[in-house]
Amino acid sequence: RDNTIGATPQVNTRHGDWIAFWHERRLGYQLKLAGSRGHSGRLIANGERLLGTLPSFFHGYTPPPSLLHGDLWSGNAGLESGGDPVIYDPAVYYGDREADLAMTELFGGFSQSFYQAYRAEHPLDPGYETRKHLYNLYHVLNHLNLFGGGYGAKAQRMIEHLLAAI
């Protein structure tokens, strides 16, 4: 069901096509919101251009749906007093497991042993190193819409990087 990521509504209606879901309910939604909040020009134009290229990031890759935390950064993970790991403040939805893993890299704070253990259990598919930027763009656009500031320039750089990767 729908929820929020921070204070931003997050539409989670089931969709049979992961690329269309990411286009419509993640990047497209955040770009539209950014435009309605006065962010325009190159950011929106290049963002819309990027939306038209999404299939090129998924050639030969069809991720099975996984239950995602949705906002998995180091501030939403920790240890109980007994040492057991816990996660909190989720923005849960079903999607590509790479989206959660990508966010753990966005702001840092996870150990190399975390990534080594993850990759030993679930090896990453080719293209992850590029797709992670596509997944993290959603969070950077959300931060732009929530906080403004330098997130617009960061989003623009990410979009340009992704367009150059095609």
Where are these regions (language model features)?
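Short, catalytically relevant binding-site loops at active-site mouths
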Residues: 6, 72-74
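Active-site catalytic-loop/activation-segment of kinase and kinase-like phosphoryl-transfer enzymes
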Residues: 2-55
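Short, intrinsically disordered, low-complexity segments enriched in Ser/Thr and Pro
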Residues: 43-65, 160-164
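Active-site Asp-x-Gly
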Residues: 11-14, 18-23, 32, 61-67, ...
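Short helix/strand-capping connector loops at secondary-structure junctions
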Residues: 134-143
